[in-house]
A protein has these predicted regions:
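Acidic/histidine-enriched, glycine/proline-rich intrinsically disordered or flexible terminal extensions
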Residues: 206-224
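Residue-level recognition of oxygen-bearing side chains
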Residues: 71, 185, 198
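Short beta-strand edge/turn micro-motifs at domain boundaries
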Residues: 22, 198-199
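GST-like fold's C-terminal all-alpha helical module
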Residues: 89, 97-195
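GST-like domain detector, emphasizing the conserved glutathione-binding G-site
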Residues: 1-129, 219-221
Length: 224
């Protein structure tokens, strides 16, 4: 059995952030599929035994169960000495961007993806428009930051990049965003991450499992 066991599902970009680090760092790990759509993470026993917060990813290591992707990435970088900040200034920038990612970048993009493609009934257009505006605002900030950089902190990939790209490899039919057309600097950085040894698409890296199904495809008119 691998030292690291990741409770995850293929549709979870937050889980992909951790899986991507493990693969690119050459660390042996195994995925543990979660019945997300079936309510496993809401089960009282699962919460008592795996994660009281009722969320994935959860990384099992040496009898511990670590949760929250940003915290896990920080722990992995410090533990293994790769993809982390190299000095105090980078440490501050890492924390700053991880918080921004969780609150604005991934937070809005992942929510829009669910509302766009995975709710049982179509989401009201006004709600979708509001969420799209939040995505566009957050992505514009990162796209501008990356305009003269290869990666978020300079010329090498770090956990900031792994965190930000968590949901960026899902198909446009799910997300409704054509990143290459709308955010070229983000798209270029995303391609650099995909060129790293160990990278795989999320649905290949993690078990598809029982996640929220894609019930609608984004149309050309909804792409940005």
């Amino acid at each position: 059995m691998a030292r690291y066991r990741l409770h995850c599902v293929g549709a979870s970009g937050n889980s992909f952030k951790v899986a991507l680090f493990l693969n690119c760092a050459g660390i042996d790990w195994e995925p543990i599929g979660v019945d997300f759509a079936g309510g496993e993470t809401r089960d009282a026993v699962w919460r008592a035994e795996v994660n009281e917060m009722g969320e994935i990813p959860v990384l099992e290591v040496d009898g511990r169960r670590l949760s929250q992707s940003g915290a896990i990435l920080s722990w992995l970088a410090e533990t293994h000495g790769v993809f982390g900040p190299s000095n105090a200034e980078e440490g501050f920038e890492t924390a700053r961007w991880l918080l921004f990612d969780n609150h604005k970048f991934t937070g809005s993009f992942a929510a829009h993806r669910v509302l766009q493609s995975m709710t049982p009934a179509p989401t009201h257009p006004d709600v979708l428009a509001y969420m799209r505006s939040r995505v566009q605002s957050a992505f514009s900030i990162v796209d501008k930051h990356l305009a003269d950089r290869r990666f978020m902190l300079g010329n090498r990939p770090t956990i900031v990049d792994f965190s930000l790209v968590g949901y960026l490899y899902y198909p446009v039919e799910e997300t409704g965003f054509d990143l290459a057309a709308a955010f070229p600097a983000i798209d270029a950085s995303r391609a650099r991450i995909a060129a790293l040894s160990g990278w795989k698409p999320p649905y290949e890296m993690m078990p598809v499992g029982n996640s929220l199904p894609v019930v609608r495809s984004a149309t050309e008119g909804l792409r940005a």
